[in-house]
Amino acid sequence: MIRPRFALLAACLLLTGCGSGAVASTGHAPGAPADPGTPTTSAAVASSPAVTPSPEMSAQGAPLNLPGLGPKTRAQVPADARQAVVVTGRGKNSPRSTVVLYRRTAEGWHADATWPAHNALKGWSDHHMGNDLRSPIGVYGLTDAGGLLADPGTRLPYHHSHGFVSPGTGFEGEPLAGSFDYVVAINYNRKPGTTPLDWTRPLGAKRGGGIWFHVDHGGPTHGCVSISERHMKDLLRALDPALHPIAVMGDAKSLAR
């Protein structure tokens, strides 16, 4: 039985941030959707602007800093973060991006997985607002998860609820059903330690919210980052609260600042 309160909250998320609830307006022609089941190739990564700084390497050959981040972005990375999900957009106005899961050891940062992804329809923003159809640039904690389907084996707190519904169609006419089968809340304008469906907005409702990692539906989102269902399960199983995981997200040029 769907609990009305959580179903209403999920519907609100669709309108304000988590990117799946609106039919595309005419006049938009976003790029072709990513193939969520195909690993990212070096050619795809090379399509990003060549602005990424060269990372310092440890004696063991691992980067000492997260690759692609400039000093401004690196300064936002907490000292205790030992797991990072880096989302690098192909351009400031592009809905296509690449997700790399990193783990920090004594030798440096190691890339454990690379996945194709979608972000918001209009790309990225340094000052995200509700309904601007851009994903927020920044560094955010990853503390809470949930979904319509049962916990696949994550170590994060997991809220299994029928409130994670995603009706309707996306910007390219694709069905949104199943988009919220698995989600990880990105701690932009939300209260950490609560269900992803929680409606607390510390920056105010106008700044949007409900920014999640969720299952890809084959097109751009309202503000979230989406990857294939298989990769969402991989992400959920990999994230470890003891490693203080974070999301680092933005277009390549912005992250390199």
Give the role of each language-model region.
Residues 211-212, 218-257:
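Extracellularly exposed regions in secreted/surface proteins, prominently low-complexity, repeat-rich
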Residues 1-11:
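N-terminal export and membrane-targeting signals
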Residues 16-17:
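C-terminal motif of bacterial Sec signal peptides marking the signal peptidase cleavage site
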